Amino acid sequence: MEDLKDKTAMQKTQIFNVIILDRSGSMQRIRQAAVDGFNETLIGIKKAQEKFADTQEHFVSLVTFCSCETCNVFDKVPVGKARPLSMNDYEPCCSTPLYDAMGFTLTAMHKQIKDIEDVAVVVTIITDGYENASKEYNGSSIKALVETLHKEGWTFTYMGANQDAMEVAMSMSIRNARNFDYSSEGTRASMRKDTTTRMNFFSRLSQMKNEAAFCAEPMSKEERLGCYGRLADEAFDEEENK
């Protein structure tokens, strides 16, 4: 029994939950809902850590952005050490450098975790408007970056208000997209959906890991990452089809 426990412990997947949250001036209208929505997401990830502790190790990164600055509120923090977001942490202003926020965040994350053997990255982008202020990255470079990371098993969800979120997501090669109503309730509802989708994915991942522990031939890293991507897409589709 001890051997099996040790084997399972060695197979834990390090899961990086990355949330890139627009902090431009127009988010003021839904500021409280955005803070509440993130905190609900954080609670969900903490529950996942408790429920799937044998197979998963969760970390949280929260990036907020406007044209004044991109702020790493949390950077790969173990979920148990992540604190709730406060209104003081999130004060909307200025414009929307979406591409720069994505580019800098994803590139840095990739450099820091690319050598981890068993890793899953779940990225959610939340914005209420179109890109309008980036200086370093453009649509083409973000599209190429997302495509590269997707091949490595990263999964992305784009949630947008006041726009065609599906069209914007497709322009960046992001498969999973949701429109949300530009209101407090619409923001909370969309973020709850994202939390439910994550929990579905974590459950599927845990089941797969438990089954894989008894396989004679372990998956290669490439096979495993491809499988993680498919599981995440299936979890998104299931939530959308409810």
Map each language-model feature to its residues:
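Acidic, low-complexity intrinsically disordered regions
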Residues: 1-242
